[in-house]
Amino acid sequence: MNIKIILDPNKDAFGRKKKGIPNRPVAYELMKKSKENIQIKWYSTNGEQFHSKIILFESITKENTVILGSANLTKRNIGNKNLEMNILLKARHDSAPISEIHNYFNLIWNDEKYTVNYETYVTKSFWKQLVYRFTEFWGASTY
């Protein structure tokens, strides 16, 4: 299995500085739990947020499934606490839409003007982990 994730570093939101929660603690947790068997990069934001979501489940022998949108994939949003919208696309691995999704992802993954390496923003802060866990558990977050 090959998992690649591009995350917003949560350094800016709506013109205000942020402290990296939730994505930095989440990225650290994902790397730790996967024994670093996933690859993570950060979108290189400059005041804006990288909020788009593309999830591609690939299969050469079966139909590919893609979820596209901007809905946060969190307990709060999946649990109907926030009205979100995504698009579900099913297509063959060699179809034009799947090819375009690959091209877009590879462009931002491989070009350093779009993404930076995981080490740039990784945080192992116990306090940030605690704040993230607390706000997620109690539904006190905006994510």
What function would you assign to each model-found segment?
Residues 1-143:
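PLD/PLD-like phosphodiesterase catalytic module centered on the HKD motif
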